[in-house]
Structure formats: C-alpha cells, structure tokens
C-alpha cells in the first residue's frame, strides 16, 4: 500500500488540483453522557454559564471552519454549509454535524472536528453541575464519535 502523505522527501499535503470539483457532504455524530439532572437543566435553560446548545453550535461551526488550521494535512475547503443539531436522551445529548461543500476533497474531517468541539463545549458549559463532591466527573463521558455518512457526487 502506497502512503499518500509521506514519500522519500518527508510529509506532504496531497495534491488535489487535478481533481474535479464535486458536491461533498459528510455527517458525523457523537454523544456526551450527562447526569439526568443536567439534561433537565439544559432543556430548561437553567445552566448558569449560559445557553449550552447555542454555544455548542457556534463553537462547532467555528471548528469546522478552522479544521485545516488544527489538522496539519487537511486542505482549506470552501464550505457551502454547516448544521449542528441535537437529540436528547434521558442521560445523553447526541450531536450531529453536517458539512457541505463543492470541492475536490471530502469534508469528513470537518464534520468530525465540528461534532468533537460541540461536545467539548457542552462539557465546558455544564462542568459546574457535572462535578461530584471531589471535583471529578464520574458520569460525564464523550463517546461514539463517528462519520455516519459521506457523499460525493457530480452536480450539473
């Protein structure tokens, strides 16, 4: 198997200039497990630090836009859209990040970055109510971050 980002000269960013622009979409998901009481506080808008979901959406969108700055071999991609949405369970929030672009390379790393930062932002916003009496986080856990869909298609 030939490595695409490493050769005898060292590490490189893969050349994509010869590739055709195509519609690209990627959807990534992940979950944060929280205490049921914390979920209730988020739903009621009673987290002291502010609007948890709005902060997570803004942070996730900004992260998508900056993916090429934090993952060294990612290309800067002209994005056409980003959506961050939430589904609630009794003791978790599932975050979905959908990223769209018309470009030469895919957007799955952007979707993964967006969902990861949105989840981290939720943790940051609720840490005061998630800590136990020793200042630890025995219930809080980020899990199941994955790409659930990747699309590449020609558009006329």
UniProtKB/Swiss-Prot annotation:
Residues the entry annotates as binding substrate: 73-75, 109-110
Example GO molecular function: cyclic pyranopterin monophosphate synthase activity
Record pathway: Cofactor biosynthesis; molybdopterin biosynthesis
Keywords: Lyase, Molybdenum cofactor biosynthesis
Cited Gene3D superfamilies: Molybdopterin cofactor biosynthesis C (MoaC) domain
InterPro entries (alphabetical): Mo_CF_biosynth-C_arc, MoaC, MoaC_sf, MoCo_biosynth_MoaA/MoaC, Mopterin_CF_biosynth-C_dom
Catalytic reaction(s) noted: (8S)-3',8-cyclo-7,8-dihydroguanosine 5'-triphosphate = cyclic pyranopterin phosphate + diphosphate
Enzyme Commission (EC) number: 4.6.1.17
TM regions (residue ranges): none
Catalytic site: 124
UniProt cross-references to SUPFAM superfamilies, sorted A to Z: Molybdenum cofactor biosynthesis protein C, MoaC
GO BP term, example: Mo-molybdopterin cofactor biosynthetic process
Protein's job: Catalyzes the conversion of (8S)-3',8-cyclo-7,8-dihydroguanosine 5'-triphosphate to cyclic pyranopterin monophosphate (cPMP).
Record NCBIfam families: moaC, PRK09364.1, PRK12343.1
Similarity comment: Belongs to the MoaC family.
UniProt xrefs under PANTHER family: MOLYBDOPTERIN COFACTOR SYNTHESIS PROTEIN A (PTHR22960)
Name of the protein this chain belongs to: Probable cyclic pyranopterin monophosphate synthase
The species this protein was found in: Pyrococcus furiosus (strain ATCC 43587 / DSM 3638 / JCM 8422 / Vc1)
Gene name tied to this protein: moaC
